[in-house]
Amino acid sequence: MKIILDGKEVTAEAGRTILEVARQNGVDIPTLCHVPALEPAAMCRLCTVELIENRRSRMVTACNYPLRGDAEVRTDTPLLRQGRKLIVELLHSRCPDSEVLKELGVRYGAELGRFPDDNKDCVMCGLCARVCERVGGNVLALCGRGVEIRVDTSFGRTARHCLGCGACARICPVNKIQIRDEGNERTVIIYGKEASRIPLRPCTSCGTPFGPVIDLSLIMERAGEAQVPAFNLSICPACSRRNHARRLAERHFEQYEIEPHEAGEDD
């Protein structure tokens, strides 16, 4: 089917979202809550675009709106830029030290600091809760309603069944989730509060704690499956690299036999 994207005719596959079609054609639509590996949730609203179908214009979120027929999409009109400017200003009040929001502020001419800082340290994109569910941790979830919505653990208690994989921290667009390894435990910190605490497995070679017990146990359970290569999960990455390098060196030098140097031979 044919789509008019910012005045240019492009071909699109039915069922593809506006965001997918835009990116395939080199059009940049800003997002904070979208990751291709997760189902779109349209939480941040930065990807709002203007859609014209059957002579009717309306605003839709590009990340989760599938195209079903010929249409026109406008991604960068003055009205859209004004809306994104306001969204960035509001989100910046929640995370005033976020570099991502500062960059978006420059892009859309936002008046950062227009709204009082409330330092919530969260833009409510929901990515951490969604990826936690996806990997099977089910530790984090969106709790509350309306302006009181927040990311939290069950009953606000420190979770002990967390995998400790760190996916929540890596996916956070404003880098507000902290992973701390102290002693034999890993702690996940959200809103400055301890969300989970997980024991770390010590390396059998050097004794250094290197990975969450629960996360490594799941990997070891799957190590016999065809799609998962077998690794020695009882030693840390540093010892594993050192052992691998030693084996490679021994294998390489076994090919050469060093002849003893005879006295009187020409050097």
Where do the PLM segments sit?
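Acidic/histidine-enriched, beta-strand-rich ligand/metal-binding domains
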Residues: I214, L218-A230, E262-E265
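Long, low-complexity intrinsically disordered regions enriched in Ser/Thr, Asp/Glu, Pro/Gly
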Residues: E254-I258
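Ferredoxin-type iron-sulfur electron-transfer modules and their immediate structural context
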Residues: M1-H161, C165, A169-I171, N175-T187, ...
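Extended, charged low-complexity segments
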Residues: R242, A249, E265-D267
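Extended interaction regions within the primary functional domain
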Residues: T77, E225-A226, C239, H261
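Intrinsically disordered, low-complexity coil segments
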Residues: N184, P260-H261
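Cysteine-rich micro-motifs
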Residues: A226-N243
